[in-house]
UniProtKB/Swiss-Prot annotation:
The keyword Lyase is assigned to this record: no
Protein name: Translation initiation factor 2 subunit beta
SUPFAM superfamilies cross-referenced by the UniProt entry: Translation initiation factor 2 beta, aIF2beta, N-terminal domain (SSF100966), Zinc-binding domain of translation initiation factor 2 beta (SSF75689)
SMART domains cross-referenced by the UniProt entry: eIF2B_5
Function recorded in the entry: eIF-2 functions in the early steps of protein synthesis by forming a ternary complex with GTP and initiator tRNA.
Amino acid sequence: MEIDYYDYEKLLEKAYEELPENVKHHKSRFEVPGALVTIEGNKTIIENFKDIAEALNRDPQHLLKFLLREIATAGTLEGKRVVLQGRFTPYLIANKIKKYIKEYVICPVCGSPDTKIIKRDRFYFLKCEACGAETPIQHL
């Protein structure tokens, strides 16, 4: 009697059992709320900024620092919203948030949004909680 050591179904089941719990039951798509942008005079306000940062599982200050550098302006975090000096279109704000997600949230190895930023010595890494990959990222 021959034993098939490479039975596909058994190997697939074994691989599935070794996945972390947060990956096994992850059935929903990664969704980030759209930025609610209003312009008042010479100021641009992102009303749901803290909600966006929470959806990305990131510190709001980190996301704010990225946005301020990208659009070259000053701004402050006031409760759940951000006030930026200058007039910026919702399209520009949305594109900058997408760029942040690509660089600082999505794992470049497996594409999972389940990541965190870790610091080792003087370097920062994007650590994926799904596949375990650590990718160096630029410090803000």
